[in-house]
């Protein structure tokens, strides 16, 4: 087991966590093969894990968490609203949803890091919260996650491509109604809508929509938006033209189709694809690039914000206790002379982050964190 500080120091402590197998890449398209279902581990992050994280997230004064509807099997679809003033009529509004395809769990980890970045006790995060309202659905299809499906909901349907059905699946209807609620007849409607996925190609990229399916003006906006995010992760995110879609016409079955038919250039609605392979990682870097790029696109200037990282002058990570443990263990972190920003996370032996215990400023002294 590896415990990791954001101050670029790795601590290894002697307790064991099972290996998480890498997925096999068969071809270059969104998701993983349908036959590769995984009933035993819910793709590494299940609905109960989400409920545990909700307990942590809702401790922040800047988060409102509520169910926006229910799935086929009756599970709540949870939405986080992150802002210092969620009732503002001037703040820029952004919507992000992830895990429509259960097997594309990398999309969740990027989304998770977006949440961590927005909730951090840092000047930039505070400035963003004071100018924006982020709505985030970390798990759009929890039934599919719990059933071990790669792309489908409990009815066995791919809800990503069901936005034009005569009778909408519950998960599609819930999200569509929420989009309408936050876009129709309010002074600050959604301006950016990101649909988080991951793909076989083992690349990070946005799905660019050709002008034949949108407009020449929108493609100019797309290029600026994608290139603006890539600017913050130049060697990690592909160029805007890496994956071009809608080159012959406008399809009508996707979330982005719905956005285009209803709001056209007024909403930057795009799919983001992370790496769906064993090389996936750097989710925090990707998340920060996305948030910064979104802010730039919306005219929120972070350049003048003082975001000097406060690094503790002396620190120590204590041995966890009890060890071995079942079902929980306690980990003490000591900052000896001054406080500072820390990120304490649990990482498996393959380097995959499985739990964030802390991502904020803590004062000098001993702070205990529990993991179960």
Predicted regions and their residues:
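Bacterial N-terminal signal peptides
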Residues: 6-18
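Boundary at the C-terminal end of the N-terminal hydrophobic targeting segment
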Residues: 20-22
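Soluble metallo-hydrolase cores and metallopeptidase-like ectodomains found primarily
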Residues: 41-94
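Short proline/glycine- and polar residue-rich coil/turn motifs
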Residues: 70-72, 360-367
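Short, acidic, Ser/Thr-enriched surface-loop or helix-capping motifs
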Residues: 71, 348-349
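Active-site/substrate-binding loop(s) of hydrolase catalytic cores
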Residues: 72-76, 88-248, 252, 256-276
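His/Asp/Glu-rich mid-to-C-terminal helical/loop segments that flank catalytic regions of hydrolases
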Residues: 278-302
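Glycine-centered coil/turn sites that cap beta-strands in beta-rich domains
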Residues: 306-321, 325-346, 356-359, 368-371
